[in-house]
């Protein structure tokens, strides 16, 4: 009817409205124009002045329209109705004062009745409701009863109010029933205006439809009435609301409790409510999910009221309308803003699948026949999102609610009712939770939450935090703002309209002070009421069978838990609130999780299908974390602790509890380490990161990336985003920049202002949004903290854990996404780098606990993963520790120690025989798990579960111990000893940590609950985190001693040494007696974790007292971790039934690990008694697994510790180790068993009679054993024969070797030495080459004991040589065919071993004959040496030569005897041998060298054999020569003594020398011949020994495979010339004539005579030592005879037949007959007769006489090479037949270079080995390197390693030491003909200056093998001496019984070597030789790892071959002869003339 046209003059229209002449329709039209165009003030004035005109115009037109509607009812009429109702609304709005005076009372009432008629369409009825409420608002108290009755009937579905006329319904009120008996005028019947149309959509639930409308219009029209007195607006709402409460609420909320008050809260914990009956209603069209309801009356109405009430507290952001990305700061048209808002809300609704209930408020347009109504109606698609245009209405409403206590109580009660709804109405509950969440987390609190004395914060610049999802604030702005106010980005600024809006605040100031005071209940009251009321959600019996409802229930519970967590971590709570929180958590945990065992078993494996299963992890985590956090902030009573103990100990059937407990203990241990021991478990001194990593750790301030990422992370997720490799670091906060001093001061101020609400003084820090758990559960849980992105500090005790949390997650998932967890910003913390441990704790716990997919630990004790990058916080040192009474560093003794009356410990060091007791119960043992996989809170369906759980656990675990008040440092408060006590000696004296005030660190704001998918709802992890954080209170506090922790009754909050200690011990025992856990798997899991916990304690102990700078050793720590605290639980666990086998195994493992450590405090007698009893029973146990566990974990150190009485178990261990060795299982601890046996082989000689427990009975019976040695050796021997494991077999062979040496040294002549030798010798040909190699090493070692072996059994050494020969003969054919280098290396080792044995025996022994059967079946005799050369010949030329009988050395069968069975059966190994690769192991790293390898392999044996031959030829019988053992080869060169050469080294001038020539002999040997001047006037005559000789000598220098040798030879002319005349020459004839010899006897007699004479001569002269000369010979002796005899004695190699002297006639040749012999004799006699006759006949003839001759004068040869030539001719080198093997060398520079190179090579194997001495207390390199001497035992040991050599004149291997005394004067040195070892002994080298120390460290550090003699009480650590080398450490620890324990540390790639092994225990008598042999073998093993490594002889052969190949000069004989005749043109030296 009224189309909108451009208006003319408003004044004109005004006049026309007032013009009574105009018709009503025209006046109406102009009225509309005035209304639409006039200002509101003018309009109000206009209406006030002309109300009657206006009403008339309206009423006339209304009547007209009503009539036309009844006639036609078309759409146009309906639109006219809309238009006229618009005027009606304006009348009601603009004239409230008149209406209040009942102006037009009946007329308006009638019109409204017509609109409200139940026959109207719903749209009109709803419009009627709206206008009726406007009218009622204006009337207020002036209305009549009828209006109130109508108000009570506006909503259909409620029972009608009663009156004197019966029930009042709306129909009755509109058309009252008439009493028609009297004839009266009746009023016209009211009829409907617009009946429903056919197309209108009906409403299923009219009650809800009208209730929503009523509630909505009550609010949105509050301000639409233009009252002159604005207070009437509020009164109008109050009027309507009070009648709503009166008429409707009793039906909607029948159980409304009016007693509940926020001001006097009822804090009784509610009862569990039974499960309602859920009925399926329908399926949701979009999601297809079933929707359920409970059919309770008015349930929907209840939900509507709740949602309506909620909407006033969840108001939208007023400041800018919706934030449209990219349009910041621009003014946008309203429609775009609306569109954006709807977009946002749509997005949100997507995320909140459960908000479907909102859809019950259907959009209204669809019900209307007209469009104009909807245009001017506010958008109301959701009751909760009221458009911003109406914010002022909401403020008024909120003001009413906040105006008096009854209204505040009403709000709280309705919210309580929300928590009582059935779970199918979870959407409404979520809204209420959201409201509470905002109240708790926002800065601007509602008035009733402010403290009574607190003033309202008005400054609008304090941003109020809002949930992150509500805003998309731009990151840059966020960063700026964060810098400015110290708040974090995720806290978006929003003007909280209800605390900061100007008009609202004015209103407050106007309102009376009294009221204001009255309604302020304070935050704590609201928190308490929330905690109690919200617990109803948990206490509703879940509908586990309906998955949708179960999901909803889980989601709701997690949301509540998240708020609890937020409160725990971020909100300041007083003692009462904390207690309330803990009580509620306890009861909730108990009621949700306690169930009968049958019920529990029923859901086994289907935990996810129950609420309890889903919530177990989160609940336990929240409970434990809250508990810890509470204890850090307030004093928690003993009763509450007892409650916790009884609840948790009754729920141990939940695996999640075990998991949470273990994670908690893990973090608590870190906190304990930090606070009590000043150690950071993630950055321990022993595993310091490399420098680079440390640099990385230094953060670079709060980086932008960090801020960006921290915007939107949930508690749980936020922690899961750790970026790889970076450790979170704390940053100084903006408020504490500046000097550390100021920071400290500030921190103290802060600590002292604990009670001031931090929110007033500190800017808020970040909050993190918390998302629900998604698939990435476990791994992501900890966010990406970069090392470079330090966490902002917060001052509360809560935020530090965040980093921890992060860390833990990392452990679980490497590919963490790159987002940062939000951290709390630093609100003024002191020492910024010291994070708060509580949070750390949580975080840390979080870190590990979170994923359902993740399993927690591996099953080995070593598998505990420690995050590498925990925050620095653990780094600070806390020095103040009490000293233990007796002065010994005391272990914290037991879980309850001496202070408590009923403990079992017998002294202050008692080992924990006490227990956690609860209500008089003692839990005698504490159990600790080892390494079973613990899935962390695995089945929690929302990820949050995990995270949080870990977090909390950490926290929680931090919270649990009681200190005994008398003995501990906790002041005033006596904690009950029942939970756990710590004796004075153990607990720290108050360490005053500066305490951070518990400031309210805002922490991640939990998720925007409405918009989270419930399935993914995660619990806030951060909780954990923060709980465990300490504020910056880790510094040693400057407070006076009376300030102590809250736990001790003081005021200091946060972590301190005493708090950490007590909390750790209480939490340790919080499960009660762990041996009472019924489920074997959980029992095992707990004990698995106990193993891990113990590992951490052990790690702490190992890291105490470690030198930080490696320059000084700190004093021993005063406080040490209680490593034996767990033993009572462990002891008890060993007594459990087999059902708990896994847990028992863990217990045994941990007992063994605990007791095989060095004990700081010696265990007392009671403890040892228990321990030995348990070990005795365990070792004899029928279950082999238990025996295996004990053997595995006691080996190798058990007997080396010297525990008092440990030898009582020797028999048990021998028997048990034997059982392990004989068991069939390969995975048994076989090596460990052999090590234990091997460590005992030296004991029997020490203890002749050993008292020990009898191994046949479990009773404790001590017997004396004398046969221990036999038992050990029997077991070791059988292992050496039959052990199926290779490494174990090797250890057994080493044990045999050690035992043989031990017996030989003690000269026990034990009969089994032969058997042991037999086993070792037979093992030489074992198929596994590693085992054979070890056997070979054992034989090699026995070389040093050859003399003792000979004494024991004279033929043993020779037998060993024969066995070696036979073994090589046996192996050679197969080895030559093999392609494996190992096989060849074995034969080479055997050859070298054979060489050492040969060199060790005298020649006489080697020449003894061997009887063997030859092929020609004749008995032949050959010496051992002969066999040696035969086998060597075979090795050089190939095994095929053995096929010739002449060359066959000896076979194994030839050696069979009583003592030696060469074919003894050895069991083969059963473990898979590592596959050989045909490539050389050494060269496998270099691929392209195959040819070299094959050549090397092929020649290996041949070259080794040739080396052995040349070595024997050169040294057998000669070594050591007069130069001593250090001199093996000649140092002489061609230029020495050579007067033709001036040079000091080989130089080209030698080639021009006429006196030298170079030759090659046999293509293998280089020979240099030099003619040099003879020596003159040398005492003793020099080379010629005083005989007449030439003036030149010949020097021959030979270079061959085994070295370089030189001989000087002189030509001898005769005896020295006697001065005086020479004797005249006499004639032979005259002599014989004068003598007249007798007639010779017959030939036979003559022969006999000779034989006799010869025999006599042999007897007389056999051992002649001087050369027979005329002067020494007796008359009857024959000179020639004597000389031959002398030669044979002194130079046996000249004998033609072994053992037969040269002067014994040769036997008669076989080929001559007796007749031929007689003929020869006769011919000789005839000749003799004829000559005799001739002489007699012509004697006197003149021609028979001659004159006397003079001796001719000798001529000096002219050639400088004459004598060389002569010698070569004598040796036959110039002959034709030698031409093929004797050649000249080309003389050139290259040859000299090659010779120099060859001469520089060692000719023996060389080793340099470092020796260190570590005195007691030395743990740093400086003190160790500056030792200048050691104990007597050490000096004796060093003396036994070798002999001292003077370095200034030592001519052997120097190992880099200097002759100039800079590296010392002397050092031990050892040499044989094949090996040289020099020891770099640290105590022998000077260390006066830094320079000498550096040099010393360089020499020692570069050695690959270190021998360390340690007298320190702690084990030596690799790394004390920092070096890249030191691949093998042999550490010797002297024991109390004069034995020595050996520890061998080697890098993993180093192969096995012996004879000593890790864990060996040996006697001092054999120690030096054993250690030396082991060091040499270790050095060889290391060399074997070098790719393409060659032994020195291989290298030497290669060099020789190169020289021969490249420098041999082929010549004709003539050229050769010429070169020999004259090597170079002769030039005469003047010096020769006078020579």
UniProtKB/Swiss-Prot annotation:
Region listing for Disordered, in residue ranges: 343-384, 714-754, 807-834, 848-911, 986-1008
In Swiss-Prot or TrEMBL terms, this protein is called: Ral GTPase-activating protein subunit alpha-1
**This protein's UniProt keywords:** Coiled coil, Cytoplasm, GTPase activation, Nucleus, Phosphoprotein
- Which residues are annotated with the PTM Phosphoserine? 710, 720, 772, 796, 859-860, 863, 985, 989, 993, 999, 1003, 1477
- One MF annotation (Gene Ontology) recorded for this entry: GTPase activator activity
At the highest ranks, the source species' classification is: Eukaryota, Metazoa, Chordata, Craniata, Vertebrata
Q: Which GO terms describe its cellular component?
A: cytoplasm; nucleus
Q: Where is the composition biased (Basic and acidic residues)?
A: 345-365, 807-817
Q: Which cysteines are joined by disulfide bonds?
A: none
Which species is this record about?
Rattus norvegicus (Rat)
User: Where in this protein does the record put region Minimal domain that binds to TCF3/E12?
Assistant: 1326-2034
Q: Where is the composition biased (Polar residues)?
A: 366-384, 824-833, 849-862
PANTHER family on file = RAL GTPASE-ACTIVATING PROTEIN SUBUNIT ALPHA-1, TUBERIN
User: According to its UniProt entry, what is the function of this protein?
Assistant: Catalytic subunit of the heterodimeric RalGAP1 complex which acts as a GTPase activator for the Ras-like small GTPases RALA and RALB.
What residues does the Rap-GAP domain cover? Answer: 1795-2003
